[in-house]
């Protein structure tokens, strides 16, 4: 395992520009974790990131997305009854777990591998202002397949609206041939 400082200068928060740079594959080095490009990048900033915080003491991340009525998904999901698809909130949490794995020193390109349980208890609509994703890292396995398992919560304007338990994200080392991800 590399240390985070081997390929970037770790910080405790990241701007939209930092996240966009990660989407180009330039933040954690060639062949390593990167975020998707817009419009699939589902956060505008990371406000907190740590190796030892959170409910399990193994890492914690907080990301945010600014809500505006012109976001692409409101135009098509659903016409006349706009709501952010719940799967995009789940994908945002997977993105954050993958980012944390790269930030913490795990090499490889990321893929979502599954989730144990998801609950949707509210909606994100265009009249809202801020989505907050809170991720607690539960377990990390580093080896041929670098694997992160985390729990997450989504809040909109302070109201808890989604919960995900046992989200799994794997990083495969495409440069060093360190194993394949399981078929999804």
Curated annotation (Swiss-Prot):
According to the record's subunit comment, the protein's assembly and interactions are: Homodimer.
- Family membership noted in the UniProt record: Belongs to the thioester dehydratase family. FabA subfamily.
UniProt subcellular location:
Cytoplasm
| Protein name as annotated | 3-hydroxydecanoyl-[acyl-carrier-protein] dehydratase
The molecular function terms in GO held by this entry are:
(3R)-hydroxyacyl-[acyl-carrier-protein] dehydratase activity; trans-2-decenoyl-acyl-carrier-protein isomerase activity
Task: Report the PANTHER family cross-referenced here.
Answer: 3-HYDROXYACYL-[ACYL-CARRIER-PROTEIN] DEHYDRATASE (PTHR30272), 3-HYDROXYDECANOYL-[ACYL-CARRIER-PROTEIN] DEHYDRATASE (PTHR30272:SF8)
Q: Which UniProt keywords apply?
A: Cytoplasm, Fatty acid biosynthesis, Fatty acid metabolism, Isomerase, Lipid biosynthesis, Lipid metabolism, Lyase
InterPro entries the UniProt entry points to? FabA, FabA_FabZ, HotDog_dom_sf
Q: Which GO terms describe its biological process?
A: unsaturated fatty acid biosynthetic process
Please state the pathway this protein functions in, per its UniProt record.
Answer: Lipid metabolism; fatty acid biosynthesis
Its function?
Necessary for the introduction of cis unsaturation into fatty acids. Catalyzes the dehydration of (3R)-3-hydroxydecanoyl-ACP to E-(2)-decenoyl-ACP and then its isomerization to Z-(3)-decenoyl-ACP. Can catalyze the dehydratase reaction for beta-hydroxyacyl-ACPs with saturated chain lengths up to 16:0, being most active on intermediate chain length.
Q: Which Gene3D superfamilies match?
A: Hotdog Thioesterase (3.10.129.10)
UniProt-annotated catalytic positions: 77
EC id: 4.2.1.59, 5.3.3.14
A Pfam family name for this chain? FabA
Instruction: Kindly state which reaction or reactions the protein catalyses.
Output: a (3R)-hydroxyacyl-[ACP] = a (2E)-enoyl-[ACP] + H2O; (3R)-hydroxydecanoyl-[ACP] = (2E)-decenoyl-[ACP] + H2O; (2E)-decenoyl-[ACP] = (3Z)-decenoyl-[ACP]
One GO cellular component assignment for this chain's record is: cytoplasm
Q: Report which residue ranges the record marks as coiled coil.
A: none
